[in-house]
């Protein structure tokens, strides 16, 4: 017995709907890859889930400088005559292409600066790279000297602050020791003044031998 025909309608159960979506999406993307490889066809598939999650596939073309999806959409627009984006989007696309090309050129220059891919360059281009490297080395040396001078200046400032703090601590120690001596001298001086001001009878002990003889 053959399988019964499945009615195509929205699946109400969210879990079953998600499972079916995952299976069908995987099948579509697999078929897109297969037809691209087997038939050397350009295929572009864009799928959005009900939650807005994107799944896409485009047959890669290593000879093209444009992103695969942009290339396919541009080709579709040219062949179908349908306008997929307005002048604003065209301008944005052109800006993206310009930035991408500029980035590619910078990557090439960076490889040249690192000594890579130099075989295809002319002597004039090699001289320009050498001058750029020399200028970069000079700028780097100047920057390092600036950092060294700043480090020495900060080191001198810290040394001066340390000397100032040491001087203040020493000054406080001197003032503190001088104050202690003044207190000690004042204490002895007060003792002498107190003894001198006492009456004679209080300053002589009654048990003194001379006093006993006088009695």
Curated annotation (Swiss-Prot):
InterPro entries the record matches: MADS-box/MEF2_TF (IPR050142), MEF2-like_N (IPR033896), TF_Kbox (IPR002487), TF_MADSbox (IPR002100), TF_MADSbox_sf (IPR036879)
Stored SUPFAM superfamilies: SRF-like (SSF55455)
GO CC term, one of those recorded: nucleus
Domain K-box: 89-175
Keyword Repeat: no
A Pfam family it matches: SRF-TF
Tissue: Highly expressed in lodicules, at intermediate levels in stamens, and weakly in carpels. Expressed in pollen.
Record key words, sorted: Activator, Developmental protein, Differentiation, DNA-binding, Flowering, Nucleus, Transcription, Transcription regulation
Cellular localization per UniProt: Nucleus
GO BP field: cell differentiation; positive regulation of transcription by RNA polymerase II; regulation of transcription by RNA polymerase II; specification of floral organ identity; specification of stamen identity
GO MF terms, alphabetically ordered: DNA-binding transcription factor activity, RNA polymerase II-specific; protein dimerization activity; RNA polymerase II cis-regulatory region sequence-specific DNA binding
Stretches assigned to the MADS-box domain: 1-61
Function, in words: Probable transcription factor involved in the development of floral organs. B-class protein required for normal development of lodicules and stamens (whorls 2 and 3). May function as a heterodimer with MADS16.
Assembly, per entry: May interact with the K-box of MADS16.
Miscellaneous comment in the UniProt entry for this protein: Antisense inhibition of MADS4 expression transforms lodicules and stamens into palea/lemma-like and carpel-like organs, respectively.
Name listed for the protein in its UniProt record: MADS-box transcription factor 4
Organism expressing this protein natively: Oryza sativa subsp. japonica (Rice)
Gene: MADS4
């Amino acid at each position: 017995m053959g399988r019964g025909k499945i009615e195509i309608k929205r699946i109400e159960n969210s879990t079953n709907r998600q499972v079916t979506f995952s299976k069908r999406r995987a099948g579509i993307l697999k078929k897109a890859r297969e037809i691209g490889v087997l038939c050397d066809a350009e295929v572009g598939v864009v799928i959005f889930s009900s939650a807005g999650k994107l799944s896409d596939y485009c047959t890669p073309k290593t000879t093209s400088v444009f992103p695969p999806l942009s290339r396919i959409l541009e080709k579709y627009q040219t062949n179908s005559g349908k306008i997929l984006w307005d002048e604003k989007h065209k301008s944005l696309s052109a800006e993206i292409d310009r930035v991408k090309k500029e980035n590619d050129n910078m990557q090439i220059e960076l490889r040249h600066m690192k000594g890579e891919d130099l075989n295809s360059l002319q002597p004039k281009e090699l001289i320009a790279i050498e001058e750029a490297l020399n200028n970069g080395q000079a700028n780097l040396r100047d920057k390092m000297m600036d950092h060294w001078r700043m480090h020495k200046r900060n080191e001198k400032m810290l040394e001066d602050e340390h000397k100032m703090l040491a001087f203040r601590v020493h000054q406080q120690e001197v003032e503190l020791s001088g104050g202690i001596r003044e207190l000690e001298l004042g204490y002895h001086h007060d003792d002498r003044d107190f003894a001198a001001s006492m009456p004679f009878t209080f300053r002589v002990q009654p048990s003194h031998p001379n006093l006993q003889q006088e009695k």
